[in-house]
Amino acid sequence: MPTTFHEIPRKRPTTPLLDRANTPDGLRRLGEAELETLADELRLELLYTVGQTGGHFGAGLGVIELTIALHYVFDTPDDRLVWDVGHQAYPHKILTGRRERMETLRQKDGIAAFPRRSESEYDTFGVGHSSTSISAALGMAIAARLQNSDRKAIAVIGDGALTAGMAFEALNHAPEVDANMLVILNDNDMSISRNVGGLSNYLAKILSSRTYASMREGSKKVLSRLPGAWEIARRTEEYAKGMLVPGTLFEELGWNYIGPIDGHDLPTLIATLRNMRDLKGPQFLHIVTKKGKGFAPAEVDPIGYHAITKLEPLDAPAAAPKKAGGPKYSGVFGEWLCDMAAADPRLVGITPAMKEGSDLVAFSERFPLRYFDVAIAEQHAVTLAAGMACEGAKPVVAIYSTFLQRGYDQLVHDVAVQNLDVLFAIDRAGLVGEDGPTHAGSFDLSFLRCIPGMVIMTPSDENELRKMLTTGHLYNGPAAVRYPRGTGPNATIEKDLEPIEIGKGVVRRQGSKVALLVFGVQMAEALKVAETLDATVVDMRFVKPMDEALVREIANSHDLLVTIEENAIMGGAGGAVSEFLARENILKSVLHLGLPDVYVEHAKPAQMLAECGLDEVGIEAAVRERLELLNR
């Protein structure tokens, strides 16, 4: 069984077996008796690597044995291995030729936090969002059949990801086309897994064997000729298996269910996977693992060790006092939610599995009957809110920008068309740093702005966020407040619950010739640039309805308008300004600054903003360049 480690090594560990198994070909040259030692070395290497870079932690520790078994049994990359979400894929990266590059994990120009097709042939499908693996692997299995190939398709999905409807859509479809594929349920929640042990492991070996499969198919042919006999036999088999395994649901959908088995028992994993590799049709293997396995602190606190920051060197010089910063925007939201809930009993809070990330912990404890975590089910979260709003509740949907994309139809069809009172608190808007393009909130202004009746707000600091949340809550109709990851500029927060006037911007600095129209948190950078250029700075506040009277006034008194937003330029807030000017036949030079028409790769947030020209240096340079053109 796995060795348990108690601290993260600060020096690279000695790993003689892992040194020979940097690729799956090297791994397959090892003897089975060596694999458990390899698992200890790989776990130690993962502890060291993530300690150096920071990153997702607990999930990878929990699939060390599974990763080894999959690459040992299957002919990757010819056999297609698809990881769901990708939090658990660091051991996979180490074993597929990227060990020496793990020092660059999640850094600019380094390897990504998630599997990427452009990074390795072993990364067969790019992931980041949850619950896509079964659909992708099914598509690969169907393509293999059309190409007369016998390559395998394997999806590894966690029990949390199975809460999403998309996963069940794929589970329902695969038996309809009799796909030759394997789904592995990595169950690390322990909620449906009490039957793990020697008997269950033994049963899994029997049920996954060729002998059992042949006997089952032969019996089916014979008994199918006898009226009622096959149905009796099928029910008897289900009853016998059901006493030991929780797989009836998957069997009813048409999958050959095996398990649950201990996901840290390498010999059993390898034997079971070898048996299942040769079976035809849709196969489902249920394994039970422990998130953070092999690192004692993570086993005790798997949520706290979901991801970690990098270790500071032991000999690091004393750090300078940190510059005072404001609270996290998510923290401001969480405090407001509790305050408003105390003032308004109609308020309910909804989140799709982001209680900690969106800062709903305090709300869930103070108002447990008004708190709803719907798990990874964004579509359901939005329509649930719509149903509540129909009955007089005031739902607040706390959701990351990137995940709101999954509930877009529900936002339009179920909320906006009916003009329901639902407030969307959109966290992680804009660039998010090391998690890269799959998690960036680059598009919400673009896809929200076109929805009739939607009020869209972009706070420039913590106090503005609190006021806008109140404004959205009191508005009779759908509203959205989008705010970034990280901390604010430490603005003074007014504790009252007073709204601001909808559709009204504010001039923060009066200048001449150049006007910077800011939608969001680039206000601090804009004010610094304005001091150098003597520019006017406008806090636009509202993307929709936009303060058209203020835009007209500014356009008539300045030579150049510069819109600034941390959203895609295409379809974004700046576009609303240009559309208004064109509609009013106001001819004015407008410069749009925002996210370019590319996926911005992972890096530190400051590096990403600089790359996009949204830091102080980039904004000033772009404005000066445009002024030079105007002055020619």
UniProtKB/Swiss-Prot annotation:
The name under which this protein is listed is 1-deoxy-D-xylulose-5-phosphate synthase
Keywords from UniProt, A to Z, are: Isoprene biosynthesis, Magnesium, Metal-binding, Thiamine biosynthesis, Thiamine pyrophosphate, Transferase
Question: What EC numbers are recorded for this enzyme?
Answer: 2.2.1.7
Query: CDD domains under this entry?
Result: TPP_DXS, TPP_PYR_DXS_TK_like
Record flagged with keyword Hydrolase: no
Q: Which residues participate in Mg(2+) binding?
A: 159, 188
- One Pfam family, short name please? Transket_pyr
Q: Extract the SUPFAM superfamilies matched here.
A: Thiamin diphosphate-binding fold (THDP-binding) (SSF52518), TK C-terminal domain-like (SSF52922)
Q: In which pathway does it act?
A: Metabolic intermediate biosynthesis; 1-deoxy-D-xylulose 5-phosphate biosynthesis; 1-deoxy-D-xylulose 5-phosphate from D-glyceraldehyde 3-phosphate and pyruvate: step 1/1
Its taxonomic placement starts with: Bacteria, Pseudomonadati, Pseudomonadota, Gammaproteobacteria, Pseudomonadales
**Where do the segments described as Disordered lie?**
1-25
HAMAP family annotated for this entry? DXP_synth
Q: Give the protein's function.
A: Catalyzes the acyloin condensation reaction between C atoms 2 and 3 of pyruvate and glyceraldehyde 3-phosphate to yield 1-deoxy-D-xylulose-5-phosphate (DXP).
* Domain of life of the organism encoding this protein: Bacteria
Q: Which PROSITE patterns match?
A: TRANSKETOLASE_2
Can you supply one Gene Ontology CC term for this chain's record? cytosol
Keyword Transferase belongs to the record: yes
The record's comment on protein family reads: Belongs to the transketolase family. DXPS subfamily.
Indicate the quaternary assembly. Homodimer.
- Which InterPro entries does the protein's record reference? Dxylulose-5-P_synthase (IPR005477), THDP-binding (IPR029061), Transketo_C/PFOR_II (IPR009014), Transketolase-like_Pyr-bd (IPR005475), Transketolase_BS (IPR020826), Transketolase_C (IPR033248)
What cofactors does the UniProt entry give for this protein? Answer: Mg(2+); thiamine diphosphate
Give me the comment on cofactor binding. Binds 1 Mg(2+) ion per subunit.
Task: Give any single GO term for biological process.
Answer: thiamine biosynthetic process
Identify the species of origin.
Pseudomonas fluorescens (strain Pf0-1)
Q: Where does thiamine diphosphate bind?
A: 87, 128-130, 160-161, 188, 295, 378
Listed under catalytic activity are: D-glyceraldehyde 3-phosphate + pyruvate + H(+) = 1-deoxy-D-xylulose 5-phosphate + CO2
Q: Which GO terms describe its molecular function?
A: 1-deoxy-D-xylulose-5-phosphate synthase activity; magnesium ion binding; thiamine pyrophosphate binding
